[in-house]
C-alpha cells in the first residue's frame, strides 16, 4: 500500500514528528553524555545531578555510595549502604560493587553481611589479583584468617609479584605458621622457595619488636634507633653503638629469627617432598640463617637431604667421617650453603685446574697477579662440628713463583669466637698451617684442632695476610687439593 501525502497538513505533521524524534534522540544522547561526565567528576553534587537525570543509574549509585561511606565530611554509612545495595542489585556480577558494599558493612560493624559480600568477590573473580587481594585484606580485618589466606593463595597463583607482600601481611596477622603455609602458600617449587627465603631473612622480621627487644636488653634510656627498614637500623647500631649494644642487637635478631626458622624447616621438607628439581642456590639464605642462628647441625641435615635427592653431588669421603664438602674440588663450588664459597677479588684469578692435581680430576688454582699487598680470605667453607672434640685437618698445597713476604696458608677458626688481638686485629683463637712460598711440589699440611666447650661451627679459610711493608705485593700461583677435616687421623 502506498501512502500519499498530498495535503500540506499531513506533510507538516510528518515533519513535526520527525523533528521531535530527532530532538528527543539528541536530548537523550546529550543527557547520557552529561550523566557520564557527572559520574566521572564523582562529587556529591555531580552524582546527585546524574541520578536526577537518570534515576537508577548503577554507576552513579555506586560512586555516591562510596562518597557517603568513605568521605569523612559527608559520612553517612546507612545512606552509603542503601546506595551500594541498590548498585549490586543493578549489577550483581560486578566485583567492585560487592567489595565496596563489604567494606562499608564492615565499617558499620555488620560483620556477617560484610563477610558474605566479600565472599561474593571471591566467587565472581578468578583472575583479578587486585580485587582478590583487597577482599582478602577485608576478611583479614574481620578476623576471618582462613578465608583471607585462601584468597591470598589465589592471589599468589595469579600474580607471583605479590609473594613478599602476602607473606609479610600474613605474619603480621598471626604467628600460626602452619595456617599460613597450608592456606596461603601454594604448594609449588617457586612459592615454597620464595616463602623459605622470606622466613630466612632477618630483614623480614618485625622491626618494631626488634627495636623494643634491643632497648630492653641494653637497658639504655636513649631513643631507639630509627630507620625505614631493618638494614638502616642495623647499620646505625653497628656504626654508632657500643660493643655491648651491637652484641645485644645481634642477640635480639637471632632470638627473633628462631621461630621463623622452625617454620622454614617445615617449608623445606614440603619443598623436597614435591620431588621436583630446583636451583639449590635459591635456598642459600636458608642455610646461612641456620648457621648464623647457631643451628649448624640442622644445616647439615638439610644439606644431606639435598644430596639424598640428587640435587647436590655426594660428598667426597676419603675418610668415613670427613666433614669437608667437595674437598677435592671435583664438583664446581656453588658458593653457598656448606660448599666452598669463592668470592671474586681484584688481582686474583681462582679457577679449576685439570693439569695439576694430587688425585681425582682436578684441583683449585689461585693465581695472584702481583697488583697489591692483598688481604686474601676469599675461599672458605663453613663446617659444623661438635664441642670439646679433637679434629684432624689436612690439605695438599703446591706453588710456583710465589713471591711475597707473607704467604698463603689455611686458617681455621671458631665462627662465634670473635675475640681479636688489639695490636694485629687478628683472631685470638685460630689454627693456621705453615705459609706457602716460592716453588714447591705437592706438600701435605696438617693441623690438630681441639674445639672449645661452645664451638659448633668452624670456618676453613684459605688466607693470606697483608705484609707489614705495604709495597710487598703477592705474585705467583698456588694449587689446593684434597682438603679434609675428620675426627680420625689421616694416615695416608
Located regions from the model:
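N-terminal leader/linker segments that initiate helical-solenoid repeat arrays
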Residues: 7-81
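Structural marker of alpha-solenoid helical repeat scaffolds
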Residues: 53, 90, 124-125, 158-159, ...
Amino acid at each position: 500500500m502506498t501512502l500519499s501525502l498530498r495535503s500540506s497538513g499531513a506533510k507538516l505533521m510528518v515533519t513535526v514528528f520527525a523533528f521531535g524524534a530527532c530532538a528527543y534522540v539528541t536530548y537523550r544522547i546529550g543527557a547520557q553524555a552529561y550523566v557520564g561526565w557527572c559520574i566521572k567528576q564523582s562529587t556529591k553534587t555531580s552524582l546527585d545531578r546524574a541520578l536526577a537525570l537518570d534515576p537508577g543509574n548503577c554507576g552513579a549509585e555506586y560512586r555516591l555510595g562510596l562518597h557517603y561511606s568513605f568521605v569523612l565530611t559527608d559520612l553517612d554509612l546507612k545512606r552509603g549502604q542503601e546506595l551500594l545495595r541498590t548498585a549490586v542489585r543493578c549489577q550483581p556480577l560486578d566485583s567492585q560493587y560487592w567489595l565496596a558494599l563489604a567494606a562499608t558493612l564492615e565499617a558499620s560493624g555488620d560483620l556477617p553481611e560484610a563477610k558474605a559480600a566479600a565472599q561474593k568477590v571471591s566467587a565472581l573473580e578468578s583472575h583479578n589479583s587486585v580485587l582478590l587481594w583487597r577482599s582478602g585484606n577485608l576478611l583479614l580485618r574481620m578476623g576471618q584468617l582462613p578465608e583471607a589466606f585462601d584468597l591470598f593463595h589465589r592471589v599468589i597463583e595469579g600474580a607471583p609479584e605479590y609473594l613478599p607482600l602476602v607473606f609479610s601481611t600474613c605474619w603480621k596477622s598471626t604467628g600460626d605458621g602452619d595456617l599460613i603455609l597450608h592456606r596461603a602458600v601454594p604448594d609449588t617449587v617457586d612459592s615454597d622457595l620464595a616463602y623459605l627465603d622470606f622466613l630466612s631473612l632477618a630483614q623480614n622480621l618485625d622491626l618494631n619488636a626488634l627495636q623494643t627487644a634491643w632497648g630492653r636488653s641494653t637497658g639504655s634510656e636513649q631513643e631507639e634507633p630509627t630507620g625505614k627498614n631493618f638494614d638502616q637500623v642495623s647499620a646505625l647500631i653497628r656504626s654508632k653503638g657500643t660493643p655491648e649494644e651491637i652484641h645485644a642487637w645481634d642477640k635480639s635478631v637471632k632470638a627473633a629469627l628462631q621461630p621463623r626458622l622452625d617454620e622454614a624447616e617445615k617449608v623445606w621438607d614440603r619443598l623436597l617432598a614435591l620431588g621436583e628439581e630446583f636451583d639449590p642456590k635459591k635456598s642459600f639464605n636458608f642455610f646461612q640463617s641456620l648457621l648464623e642462628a647457631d643451628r649448624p647441625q640442622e644445616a647439615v641435615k638439610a644439606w644431606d637431604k639435598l644430596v639424598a635427592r640428587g640435587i647436590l653431588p655426594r660428598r667426597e669421603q676419603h675418610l668415613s667421617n670427613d666433614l669437608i664438602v667437595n674437598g677435592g674440588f671435583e664438583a664446581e663450588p656453588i658458593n653457598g650453603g656448606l660448599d666452598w664459597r669463592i668470592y671474586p677479588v681484584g688481582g686474583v684469578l681462582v679457577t679449576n685446574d685439570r693439569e695439576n692435581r694430587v688425585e681425582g680430576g682436578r684441583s683449585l688454582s689461585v693465581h695472584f697477579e702481583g697488583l697489591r699487598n692483598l688481604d686474601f680470605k676469599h675461599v672458605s667453607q663453613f663446617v659444623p662440628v661438635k664441642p670439646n672434640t679433637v679434629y684432624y685437618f689436612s690439605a695438599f698445597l703446591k706453588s710456583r713463583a710465589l713471591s711475597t713476604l707473607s704467604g698463603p696458608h689455611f686458617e681455621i677458626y671458631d665462627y662465634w669466637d670473635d675475640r681479636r688481638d688489639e695490636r694485629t686485629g687478628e683472631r685470638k683463637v685460630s689454627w693456621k698451617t705453615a705459609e706457602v712460598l716460592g716453588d714447591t711440589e705437592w706438600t701435605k699440611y696438617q693441623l690438630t684442632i681441639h674445639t672449645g666447650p661452645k664451638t659448633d661451627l668452624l670456618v676453613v679459610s684459605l688466607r693470606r695476610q697483608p705484609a707489614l711493608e705495604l709495597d710487598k705485593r703477592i705474585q705467583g700461583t698456588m694449587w689446593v687439593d684434597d682438603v679434609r677435616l675428620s675426627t680420625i687421623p689421616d694416615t695416608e
